[in-house]
Amino acid sequence: MGVFLMKAVHFGAGNIGRGFIGELLFESGFETTFIDVVQPIIDYINASHSYEMYVIDNNYEKKVIKNVKAVSSITDEPAAVEAICEADIITTSVCVDNLDKIAPTLAKGLKERLNRGGSKVNVMACENAFYATDMLKKALVENKKAPITEAELDEIGAFPNVAVDRIALCKVVDGVKIPQIQSTFELVIEKDKMVDSTAQPIKGAEYVENLGMYLERKLYVFNCGHAATAYFGYYNNRATIFDALEVPEIKADVIAVMKESAMAMTKKYPFTFEELEAYIEKIIKRISLEELHDEVVRVGRSPIRKLNAKDRLVGPALLAEQYGLDNSHLAKAIAAGYAFDCKDDEQAVEIQNYIAENGIEKAVEKYSSLTAEHALYQKVIDAYKALKA
């Protein structure tokens, strides 16, 4: 391994860890230590201090990521602590539900780093959630196994939030999951919270002051369009997102949904409609790859969460209403969400049972917090009844 490489620590050697963040760290000149709990993946990485990944939309081109090693936080925590002490950057991709599980090891490492008089380090949670680094910091303070105070954390670390976006799948080869990723991605970092706000340690990332607008753009445009495709596709008996977007009417409806959302975003934030249109075009291209085999029931799953007033469909529809803009296609997508009756989805079953007992009006009130005083309320109900007619 190169002697002069900067050192990175990354928690989580899954699809996003190896296929996204790990690749960027390698391209940025870091030697990366992955901290994980899955022994076969740890052994696989350590066998050659490298790993393979494939780029889906480039004829599955193979890439080999080098200068890597892996340690188990279960069987070799001292090595994990040592790596944290020496790291020039620390990142995670373990899923937000697991941040409290990695907190003790990370807290122990940061505390030891502080005791040794180490330099301040950027710690970033690259998770698919709003303000995940804030959640990680909270988990560090609240963990009981390796106590560390917020003041100590601020002395030894900087905690910028990030927005992540990349489609990362995998295939199993000899019992190990090998990442298969799309070439396009977004990694947006809150620069004013970094140790040095002028530094750009990760190549290919964007460094911005107002992260909130980028997080909301992802939820209200990308996730919005993805969910709309799933619900329209399911209603029309299409198996995958690719199949759904092959139907011209569905594709037109999905683009109309995203444009309504985008128009509302231009009123709230300094985005131009043209740049959001380009973003929509990029998204449609990304999600309509046949090779993804992305099932509509997967993308549409957990409709209680997705039909919440602050989430991907009702959120932008209410924003459009607030600015007096058209949201009729968004209302139709919300209605399709209420018609999503997948038997294998607990939340879908709950919604369907509730509609059967109480009617769509009460369901929209309960799950989307919409009432008759919202113009959107009646639009959703009318659209739902039209779907059911």
Language model: regions and residue ranges:
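Short, Lys/Arg-enriched N-terminal segments with co-localized hydrophobic residues
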Residues: 1-5
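Substrate/ligand-engaging "lid" and interaction regions
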Residues: 6-11, 15-389
